[in-house]
Swiss-Prot record:
The gene is murD. Disulfide bonds: none annotated. It catalyses: UDP-N-acetyl-alpha-D-muramoyl-L-alanine + D-glutamate + ATP = UDP-N-acetyl-alpha-D-muramoyl-L-alanyl-D-glutamate + ADP + phosphate + H(+). GO terms for biological process: cell division; cell wall organization; peptidoglycan biosynthetic process; regulation of cell shape. Cell wall formation. Catalyzes the addition of glutamate to the nucleotide precursor UDP-N-acetylmuramoyl-L-alanine (UMA). This is UDP-N-acetylmuramoylalanine--D-glutamate ligase. Pathway: Cell wall biogenesis; peptidoglycan biosynthesis. Belongs to the MurCDEF family. One of its GO terms (cellular component) is cytoplasm.
Amino acid sequence: MKSNFSKFKDFIKYKKVAVVGIGVSNRPLIKFLVKLGAKVTAFDKKHREKLGSISLELEEIGVDLVLGENYLDKLDGYDVIFKTPSMRIDRPEFVKAKEAGAYITSEMEEFIKYCPAKVFGITGSDGKTTTTTLVYEMLKKEGYRTWVGGNIGTPLFANIEEMKEDHMVVLELSSFQLMTMDVSPEISLITNLSPNHLDVHKDFEEYVWAKKNIFKYQSSDNLLVLNKDDDLTNGMENEALGDVLKFSLVEKVYNGACLSNNKLTIQGKEICDSKDIKLKGRHNIANLLAAFCMVNKYVSIDSMKYVATNFSGVEHRCEFIREVNEVKYYNDSIASSPSRTLAGLNSFEKPVILIAGGYDKKIPFEPLAEGGYDKIKILILMGDTKNKIKSAFEKVISHKKCEMEIVIVNSMEEAVKVADNMAEKGDIITLSPACASFDMYPNFEIRGNEFKNIVNSL
């Protein structure tokens, strides 16, 4: 049952509130809390010089700042603490604050709790952003006032008072955001599950447990959408509290969506032919099927078909850049896990020259090597994980008695130069790192943009 936002306004007024993190996504939250009458202190590891003008901007509206290396040591004495999603709730500083009586929460928890609109929540290891965007586009095409947020778009909590009951909200939710959730969206989807973010989660079990929070608190009239082709998600049907729809690329599904004789269908109704879809790869057909399940109750077949046959993809996701000397370049910088890179490799008709490697999330690369060795012509590796990925592939190559050239490089520029020199006419070169970007870049967008800039300068 949704709570009225006036309850939150009454609760937060005059409260001593700490907001941990002064990043771009938290700034609207800080300003909104001030507007609601809270006494806000913003915490950040960065010093004033690094933060730039935002520190002055916040101080001018009455926000106190706690900055620098030991910033979390000063979390005592607050009524409410808004934590940044990637920070674990069991950090000693949060445990101590909670024991002292602080209410620890996050922007997303409070948003879902009080949002008057219908909320569609999407999580999973792969396909989240594309599916979130597809659901958003389908609802928008049908004529709904639709908002998009979570991991993409803009932070929505500051806009909550503009939202109405007949609006629609589509959220991409990470395991970090879901970890402390005690509220679930009315319509929820888990795209698939494979090991990811094990640098933050204790183990894969905890990662899966966090993902389940997207449906754990649903009611009997809510909907959960599950991937029938993924054993882990398929088995979650038994834990669902409301209705369940499933989607599949390989089996006929009557209570859900499937690919049947190259036709995309929802509950037996044909939407379109797979050859008419602009999105590249079977994984994107799965994303479309998942989106159909989510919007089935609210969107016409015509709106679904329009989006399916006109939507050409999201930047940094198997994005075609250009063709140089009959060699095609693709940017798949979003691929920050082995399973996502495998999905990208499967979307090409022939083995590719793959540029991979990056920040180490403590996840295994053996599944990528075993599933991808025959889809890669040349493997170019960089970043913290280069030797770890090389080792995984060398084992598989030795076992399969096959050949693959593996080249280690030290920068994106060198990777593109090597790929360009080694490529032959008709080859495909793709950046699909199988890793996060944080060893070399602040995020996957900046990594993808650098790759595109280098390719465009060839």
